[in-house]
Structure formats: structure tokens, C-alpha cells
Amino acid sequence: LERTSQGWLNRAAELGVANPSRYDTCAWADFDHDGSVDLFVNGTVGGGGHYRDWLMRREGDINFIDVTPTEILERNASHGATWVDYDLDGDLDLALAGSAIDGTHALLENLLRPEFAWHSLQVRVLDEKGHSTRPGSEVRLFVSGTDRLLGTRRVDSGSGYDAQSDLPVHFGVPGGQKVDVEITVPGGGRRSVTRIDGVDPRMYQGRSLEVRTDHR
């Protein structure tokens, strides 16, 4: 649903995500580091059947295409899904949980080529004491020295069904270029903004950029 001046517009069909099915959860992430967010949708189990899962890659500005690998289709996972760089190689991996009688909990490693895997930046938003108490904060990345927006993420600690989001927000950074980071923390009737300019993603391989923000 896209919010317009006339109300809400359903664009699912034209974007290629209007798949007739039943789902438990979805998870957005730029798993290929092209600068656009991609979509994983987890099919539910019910009525004696299992609805298939979908991994949809964003192509250009207006299309998603189905790139679901057999490794996902064979798992028949449902319910939980979250993206996380568990092996700290720069790209996002996918953790899945299910409701089958014999149990399913798959951890799928993203095998993005190393030269592209490190075209990324993870940002962990902290409070003034260094604690992760800033859910709801907005993180924006700009091409360094410009107002060209590369992406926006929200610090999310609770989304997902049978899953919890990883607290660092993850950005694909095409070309691994330097970026300016802007963090907005809402609370107490105001919006506090913190900026760090000229961040080189290569300096944060295998770790997150940790940013302490002002008191709300």
C-alpha cells in the first residue's frame, strides 16, 4: 500500500508481489547490496497444506522478481523469519523457524561474492550510556557530502512472528562508497538528530558502526 494525497493505493500487482497465498510473516532486506530492499515472505501451514515461501528481489524501481532458491523451498519453514549477518562477512543471512511436527529451524548462509559482501554498513544506535534502548530510531544514509539519500531504516526490536529483529540496521552500499549517517531519535515530544559524516564502510568490516545518541 502506497500512501498518496488521495489515500492508500494498492500497488502489489504492478510491483510483482501480488501472489495469491497465505502468509505468516515477511522480512525486508537488501540481501544483494544493490541499494534496493528485497522481500522474503513466509508461507503459512494450515488446512492440511503448506503455502510456499517467496524470496523476491527488487529489480530497478518498479519490479520484484521471484528468485526463491530450492534450499528455501525444501525447508517448508513457516512463522519465524529474520535477516542477520551471523558470520560477520558483510552480507545478510536468513534464519527461519517453522511449525512442523518434527521442528524446523534453518539458518541459510548468504554466499554473496566477497567483493560485494563488504559493500555494506551496519549501524547500531545506542543511548548515551551505550545501551541498545533506541527502538523506533530512524537511520538515513546519504552519499557523503551530498543530500542524495541512499536508504532509510528503522531500529526495530520486535517485528516478526516467532522471531526478533537483529538490532543493528543493515544497508547495502553500492560500490562501498563513503556515506554520511543521520540518526533521528523521537521521544519526549521532540526529535533529536545525530550526524556522522564521511563514514568509510571498509573500516567497519565484521563489526557495526556504534553511535551514541543524545538523551531523549
Residue ranges of predicted features:
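Disulfide-stabilized cysteine-rich extracellular repeat microdomains
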Residues: 5, 13-16, 31, 45, ...
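Short, conserved, GDST-rich strand-edge loop motifs in beta-rich repeat architectures
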Residues: 42-49
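Beta-propeller blade termini
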Residues: 23-33, 79-88
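Short loop/turn motifs that recur once per blade in beta-propeller domains
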Residues: 9-22, 65-76, 130-131
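Acidic/hydrophobic-patterned starts of short beta strands in beta-sheet-rich repeat architectures
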Residues: 33-42, 89-97
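Beta-propeller blade repeat segments, especially FG-GAP/WD-type strand-to-loop junctions
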Residues: 1-11, 49-66, 102-118
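Beta-rich catalytic cores
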Residues: 22-25, 51, 77-79, 103
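Gly/Ser/Thr/Pro-enriched helix-cap/hinge segments flanking short amphipathic alpha-helices
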Residues: 63, 69-74, 82, 88-216
